[in-house]
Amino acid sequence: MARLAGVDLPRNKRMEIALTYIYGIGPARAKQLLEETGVSPDLRTDNLTDEQIASLRDVIEATWKVEGDLRREVQADIRRKIEIGSYQGLRHRRGLPVRGQRTKTNARTRKGPKKTIAGKKK
C-alpha cells in the first residue's frame, strides 16, 4: 500500500483517483502531479514502483502544502478573520454561511438541524 503525505492510498483505484484522497489534491492537481512525475494515470496504486512513489512524494513535498500543514493554515486564516473582527469572521463565529448565501431557507449544513418552535395553540 502506497503512503503519501501521511495518507494510505486505496490499493485498487487508479492513481488519478487515489491521489484525491490526500487533502489539498483534487482532480486537476492530481493530473498535473502525474504529468510532472511521468506516472500513468491509469496505473493502479498496487502497481507503483518504489521509485514512482518516491518521485510523487518529492514533488508533493516540494510544491504544495497538503494535509496537516494546509489544514493548519486554513484554521489560522479563519482565526485571524475572527480576531480582526471582519464580517467573515463574525459569520464564522456565529456558525453561519460566510460567502453571502441565503439563510432564510436552506443553510442547514452550516446551521445544523432545525430547532422547532411550538406553534400557537387554539
Curated annotation (Swiss-Prot):
- Keyword Transmembrane part of the UniProt annotation: no
Q: Name one GO cellular component term.
A: small ribosomal subunit
Q: Which UniProt keywords apply?
A: Ribonucleoprotein, Ribosomal protein, RNA-binding, rRNA-binding, tRNA-binding
Provide the function of this protein: Located at the top of the head of the 30S subunit, it contacts several helices of the 16S rRNA. In the 70S ribosome it contacts the 23S rRNA (bridge B1a) and protein L5 of the 50S subunit (bridge B1b), connecting the 2 subunits; these bridges are implicated in subunit movement. Contacts the tRNAs in the A and P-sites.
Lineage in the entry?
Bacteria, Bacillati, Actinomycetota, Actinomycetes, Mycobacteriales
Q: Which GO terms describe its molecular function?
A: rRNA binding; structural constituent of ribosome; tRNA binding
- Record-linked HAMAP family: Ribosomal_uS13
Q: Which domain of life is it from?
A: Bacteria
**The keyword Calcium is assigned to this record:** no
Regarding protein family, the annotation reads: Belongs to the universal ribosomal protein uS13 family.
Q: Which GO terms describe its biological process?
A: translation
The name this protein carries in UniProt is Small ribosomal subunit protein uS13
Region of interest called Disordered, as start-end residue ranges on this chain: 93-122
**Record organism:** Corynebacterium efficiens (strain DSM 44549 / YS-314 / AJ 12310 / JCM 11189 / NBRC 100395)
Quaternary state and partners of this protein? Part of the 30S ribosomal subunit. Forms a loose heterodimer with protein S19. Forms two bridges to the 50S subunit in the 70S ribosome.
Among Pfam families, the record links this protein to:
Ribosomal_S13 (PF00416)
